[in-house]
Amino acid sequence: LEMENREIDGAEKMVPIVFLVIIGTIVVYGFLAGPIARRLGLAEAHVDGVLIAGSNAVARGLAGSLKSHGVKSLLVDTDPYSVTRAIAAGLPARRMSVLAEEAARDLDLRGIGRLLACTSNDEVNALATARFVRVFGRREVFQLAPTKLSAGGASVPEEYLGRVIGIQPITYAALDERTRSGWRVASVSGGSTVSNAAADGEFMPMVRVVDGKMAFLCRNDPIPSDGHVIGLAAPPFLERLS
């Protein structure tokens, strides 16, 4: 990646090869991670909670909104400040790399059935989904859209990505830009209020919650008309909700 940033000839061809090696290693360990975690009672099948890689403002907001609907979450981040803020807000959080070999073994994944990779690093997000696909299954590993993929110059091979959240793919850069402009995570009743705000560019739907069951919204999903929709809301929309 450093070679690519310095525009060294052939660097762009090496990135997929590097990812093949790294992900191949992760998959080998991953084949054991799921069965071991379930045997130890650390992970369960068919549960609704979410492991969130990243403890930034949006990740904490999502975890807080999910908690208000009775959905369990666990935040994991290497940044002590972000983890401390999560704990201070009453959210379960661990200071740990989601890519650590011991992560699937040491994290208490009881009640957790899916992953959201929500860090600022595209490569970490892709590698996290590769590691946890054997714990949760291919359909239950989600991530933000890689910035370079959205721009048409992916450094992460698309076949290694988890399921990208957002009816329109959401990048970390988009989330960061909006939170710096006062956007905040909000939970809104499904229906015309949400659909109108989304159409006006004032709301980014991310999660649907119905009767305590959550589902990430992905490409081309319809905006829910029932339950609650959790997403990032612009200041004018937040004012109308208050």
Where do the model's predicted regions map?
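Cytosolic regulatory regions of ion transport systems
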Residues: 2-242
